[in-house]
């Protein structure tokens, strides 16, 4: 299958969406499919570096200068998509590249599906201080974008419930993003490495290590954990909170920890190298998060893949993930956070290897890729079925002469198909030599 992914965000822009798209591309390619990403230009990467990544002219997005939107490239994108003979388009944004993907899909008469990644009500206030898009505008804008698509993928039940509340009627399917397990299982990490890291962080052997790992922003609600630290320490003084990451809210959190006089039990590490993240997951006793704005949250399943249980503010997504006490403890009000931490420390059982192996497959990139491909197949079958019904209606309402022409045309189809296949095969053989030059010609 030949798939076009259309996104405003891709590496080197780091985000959960970028990670999800790269994971999907890699998993589909492992199964022999061709995947082409249509995205924005970036000054930190060469435009024609990878022939499977088509970068279109773009400018920084208002209020988010590290994010970009395309300002031209419709004709060139159409030519490239036609050249690659795409079977399906999968949009990952409702903005510039998403709209572009919809138009190209319509022009090529191929299915277009979408993944809804972001709950915009939580973020519209950051776009020109909420003067351009207000929360009340999200529903009609999203319904307008989705109404003529062939299907939408929901990364969690949170998104499914949201879209059903918006009365979105197109086919919907819950498919959480998976992760590459090999990056987090990491049996090569030794007990000595874990001990050394804890020593560096000032954690004694009899102390419990809680790990928060995320971008340090107000929405992540790390302040809720720090606010509860006095009460947590009153119950159990042998607890240390390690906060990994960087962001605009870092200094506020440091000040809060000092103000509450818990700074000796709260350590801020800043960013850590990506190849060290698994070590932190392995070293901690629990991964903790108080965020209420996540539609899924990859850090939760990264922790579980590492074999570490979580403590988190519950939601429909986590209800589906934490299916056993050994996987974690959920709470549903901030006032219950202290009790959740103490309960987790006292009552979390040892991980059962069989159940952990099953859970790891559920959250794996492999399972994610296969689930998306199945959705693509179902979408193509549904589209072909609709077209067949239209053809049937046409035949039933047309005269005998029209039917005869269709039959006569069908007689010559095998010859035409053979000829097209032969021509396509020659093009495929020549493609590797001319591919990069062809893309440059299209885009210039």
Task: Tell what function each PLM region has.
Residues 81, 145-146, 271-272, 279-284:
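Short alpha-helical donor nucleotide-sugar binding micro-motif in glycosyltransferases
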Residues 324-335, 343-349:
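Conserved acidic donor-binding segment of nucleotide-sugar-dependent glycosyltransferases
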Residues 41, 158, 178:
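Carbohydrate-associated surface elements
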Residues 204-220, 226-229:
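Conserved donor-binding/catalytic core segment of Leloir-type glycosyltransferases
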Residues 1-45, 49-55, 403-444:
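N-terminal subdomain of nucleotide-sugar transferases
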Residues 309-312:
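Short hydrophobic beta-strand element within catalytic cores of glycosyltransferases
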Residues 350-402:
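A charged, aromatic-enriched C-terminal amphipathic alpha-helix characteristic of glycosyltransferases
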Residues 292:
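Aromatic "clamp/platform" in nucleotide-sugar-dependent glycosyltransferases that forms part
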